[in-house]
Amino acid sequence: LHGTGLRPVQRVLKDMGFENVYIEPSQAVPDGNFPTCPYPNPENPDAWKLALELAKEKDADIVLATDPDADRLGVYCKDTKTGEYVTFTGNMSAMLIGEYILSQKSANGTLPENPAFVESIVSTDMGKAIAAAYGVKHIEVLTGFKYIGEQMLKFEKTGCNNYVFGMEESYGCLPGTYARDKDAPAAVCMLCEVAAFYKSQGKTLWDGMIDMYEKYGYYREGISTMTLKGIDGAAQI
């Protein structure tokens, strides 16, 4: 969304072998004025209008958007039963990635000793169920990815656990230890791999989410957003 994500995302998708990638041209150019969406946040439905129009034209399986500094990832997926594109919350997309990582590492015998799944206290409790299913320690931290990074540093210093995945509900996750903040290009890599995994089974990401609800239970979530602008808004905050 008029930011820094396009170049790394295009590069990693190309390196992974994804060829049918379409870019919404009017939002591809970095521009701090954000001419097509004054509030360039993947959580904001208005930011998706142009991308969804392109997705319908191309009959795309999934639609991805990163925020201007490329730390958060939003996603829509086509529901083949209705033909409509449905949105995923940050909790939903992170659970798809986290469950995939744990299931694949478990199946391949690459899950490290004392593995840990870290998430913020405002994130979905589905993470607890997923971690428990694979014998992974689940750790909750305060809101803010720096606290997840703090756990990573603790693990490295003490050896008490090995970080496997971390996430927060505000559309951010980190599937590795190379950074201490959420990373949208890495999330793109993982979510596209998950989508390809389900597609190989004749399923969509949405089908995969339904499978997870059936396996781990349905976790209802909701969020209220309040915008307070300018000096008056700052005073109210």
Residue ranges and their predicted role:
Residues V9, D71-N91, G127:
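Short Gly/Thr/Asp-enriched flexible loops that form oxyanion-binding sites at enzyme active sites
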Residues K56, A60-I62, E84-V86, Q104-I237:
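Phosphate-binding and adjacent anionic-ligand microenvironments
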Residues R11-V75:
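N-terminal small/polar loop signature for handling phosphorylated ligands or for N-terminal nucleophile
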Residues E19-I23, G83-L102, A186-M190:
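Gly/Ser/Thr-rich active-site loops/lids in small-molecule metabolic enzymes
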Residues L1-R7, A70-R72, V122-D125, G230-D232:
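Gly/Ser/Thr-rich loops at beta-strand to alpha-helix junctions
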Residues G5-V9, Y22, G32-N33, L73-V75, ...:
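Short helix/loop capping segments that flank catalytic or ligand/cofactor-binding pockets
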Residues D46-L50, I97, Y147:
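Well-ordered alpha-helical segments embedded in enzymatic catalytic cores
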Residues P25-V29, G90-A94, L142-K146:
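Short, acidic/turn-prone active-site loops that include or flank metal/cofactor-
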